[in-house]
Amino acid sequence: MARVMDPAGAAATDDRAIHKVPDPFPLTLAGMLAALGPQAINFGISIGGGEAYLLPNVSARGTLHMHWLMTISVVLETALVYECIKYSVCTGRSFFAATNDLKPFGFWPWFWAVVSIMTFAWPAWMGGAVIAAHRFTGIGNPPVLGLPPHYIWAVVALLAVLVVFYFSDRTYNFLSKFFTFIMFANIVLVLAVTIIAAKPHHYWQVLLGYLGITFALEGYPAALPKTDALALFNQPGGSLMWVSFWVIAAGFGMGKYAGQVTGVLKPPENITAQELRWNTADPGERRKMEQWVKLGGYSLILWWAIIGGLVMTYLYSVCGLAYLHEDFLKTGQIPSGVQVPIQMATIAQGVLGPMAGWLMLLIIMVTLYDAQFPIYDTFIGRTTCDAIAVSGRARRPYRFYYFVVVTAAVAAGFYLITVAQPFILWIGVAISALVYRSIGAWQILLLNNRRLPDGFKVSKLNSWLLWITVVTGFGGVGTWAVTVLPGEIAKRFGG
């Protein structure tokens, strides 16, 4: 019988069942398309707030000097997410459940549950979506109780989240199909608008920003708020460690045996929060697992890092520069308040006419709103339920706690949607995510080197990238907290 290390580090007899490693998809374009689901969701989370709120806003000022931060961010986040994918493919267990094995034992899953709720329960993405829905339809609620005219759309949107989750066959199946459609629709429309709107010098100017050449020649731009620059370092703002849930749900590697959340009309499945075992000594099994890991990594690099993280953020920046910058030079004004979420629709309408503006409003509405599904399902629901599961105190099926948590989070959204403008909320989420990325990088480095078999541990290159992630994330947010945050607080509260 095999022997493993228990969470406390003592040798223990491993009597878990040994599972066969499923046959992986081929490492071809067809295989990449078959493996698209997790990265389509990751893409949808990434191409949303930053692209609708931040990038056109920064480009409108012409302050592209710090776009090189996004290039570095894509590299660092790719290394982190790849290691999280590797762990979950090899174990069938999420990153968040795995942190239960890190000292202090039992603390970290609850840490992640609490900070996820505190950070992502604020409907920063949906706030922009409902503004777009109000503009798109012209339908709003009367100004009663001080509620904004788009509040009725928040009610519809939040109720739709619950309906989808309660009555889906499997929640992941809905997310995967929905986000795949949105991903390709977003790519086609933004590409069309960019080709028509932009001139060659716009492409070149943005490229110089991404490569850091503009910053090297001109230094830091005075017109760019330092908070926005820090938010750029979180772009394209992917799903970080939460991608581990989706590769499990997609059935990658040991994920095939892990169980999924089902709707209320289906019987609950047994969802494990423990590592699943496979024969690591069998060369054939190792080859299959290695291909699953490669598939997860290649899919991440193609769909999220290259297409989402580099190409799409580049196109959104070119659009903002090509259309909004000219108005900024004339008026000195940039979109603010409720105008921020719809600024890309403003670009489309100015370039292609009213019909395109309406279509872009629809795309903005959907691409911002779609983020709320995985935020409630995965960032809040699954993270919290994994904390409950690994505690050993669950007395009901995993799905019961999932629906309690998700329903409570959605109910809170009816109030939280009224608290602040979505761009302000999104900036707060972006800065918090830098801290979470740093903690996650440190934890996955420990987990993969301790828990995975030889040949699957963290490479030297990724070890360096993960440590750079830790240092730059904490360093950037710490510097901002000391030098910028006090002034922002004083400005906000008149101090």
What residues fall within each predicted segment?
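Membrane-interface "cap" regions at the ends of multi-pass membrane proteins
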Residues: 1-53, 257, 264-276, 288-291, ...
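Flexible loop linkers connecting adjacent transmembrane helices
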Residues: 16-21, 55-59, 82-107, 133-143, ...
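Extracellular loop-to-transmembrane helix junctions
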Residues: 30, 57-82, 97-109, 152-153, ...
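Juxtamembrane transmembrane-helix boundary signature
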Residues: 42, 69-102, 109-126, 374
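Hydrophobic transmembrane alpha-helices that form the core helical bundles
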Residues: 107-144, 154-155, 368-386, 474
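Loop-to-transmembrane helix boundary motifs in multi-pass membrane proteins
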Residues: 146-157, 387-418
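C-terminal membrane-solvent junction of multi-pass transporters and transport-like membrane proteins
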Residues: 178-181, 381, 395-403, 426-483
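Hydrophobic alpha-helical segments and their helix-loop junctions in multi-pass secondary transporters
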Residues: 184-221, 226, 233-248, 439-452, ...
